[in-house]
Amino acid sequence: MVRYFLFLIATAMLIAVGPVIAQADNFQSWLTDLRGEAHQRGVSDAIFDAALGDAKPIKRVIELDRSQPEFTLTFDEYLNKIVSKTRAQKAAQKLVEHDEILTEISKKYGVQKRFIVTFWGVETNFGQYLGSFNVPHALATLAYDGRRSAYFRKELLNALQILEEGHITPSQMKGSWAGAMGQSQFMPSSFLSYAVDWNGDGKRDIWGTKPDVFASTAYYLKKAGWNDQLTWGRRVSLPDNFTMDGKDAMTLADKKIRKNLQLWAAAGVRSADGSLLPKANPVARLVMPSGAKGPTFLVYSNFDSILDWNRSNYYALAIGHLSDMLK
């Protein structure tokens, strides 16, 4: 009877362990296939092994990728979470602390200093939290998982290329569970396209070299169409029962509907305090993040550049609000 009981335990253990062993074998086979593709990208065996030699799927990464938030923040809740007085005060201090280098970078790329610091503050709290995940391992997990494997496989190969170029070591390549890296939280593809070696040391170090971080942020925004003659937009007030061209406000709050600022002014749109809109005449569009009963904004082309960085209206408005506190 005891032998039979032990046999049952052993059988159960084999059944439980079997899928794990199979998964591990499949992952190693997948890595072998990836190695060949990495070779074609110029990645050496030494870098591949240093980055992925001990890699295995990270359970927590899968959990985070598949988890759904229990609730959705309202715009006001999100704004209060991201744009605090403490963060604004710290941003103002950073503007003064790094004024010289920020001024140089701002002039070269045509991006206002306050926006560079704002992105830095929102992304990583001014470099204080970069993420603790091993980026190659996290990306390998997501690429192997299969939900968005093609995207993350490309990002993993990009990460290996960054390592091959010597910008960072595998052990130092830390970031978010999804692979966003450094103080600017660039995905590897964004790093390869936009990261800047400002100090000329041969490394585009967005992890530890602040001038590289600032220049990379500014260059990204420049390539996204930033115009330093404009701000991001402004909060506005609408007249009661507002319509324009026979359309109500919610219908007008469409990315495709853009009008010169003075046309909005002629239709009765005013600044949030009731004053007239500026006399400048950039193209603007309505954004109403909380619907008809919430706040209303007129945003300019720079707002779209922010959306290029992060596609959330909440995020872009938070960037705008925090930057306004640094004027």
Where are these regions (language model features)?
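Bacterial N-terminal signal peptides
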Residues: 6-17
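Sec/Tat signal peptide C-region and signal peptidase I cleavage site
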Residues: 18-24
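An acidic, Gly/Ser/Thr/Pro-rich helix-cap/linker signature
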Residues: 24-106
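Short, functionally critical alpha-helical segments immediately adjacent to catalytic or ligand/cofactor-binding
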Residues: 38, 49-57, 110-127, 159-162, ...
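Secretory-pathway/luminal and periplasmic proteins that interact with or process carbohydrate-rich
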Residues: 57-64, 124-133, 145-149, 165-171, ...
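Substrate-binding/active-site groove segments that recognize
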Residues: 134-143, 156, 181-196, 217
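Acidic, glycine-anchored loop motifs typical of Ca2+
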Residues: 198-206
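C-terminal soluble interaction/assembly domains
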Residues: 239-327
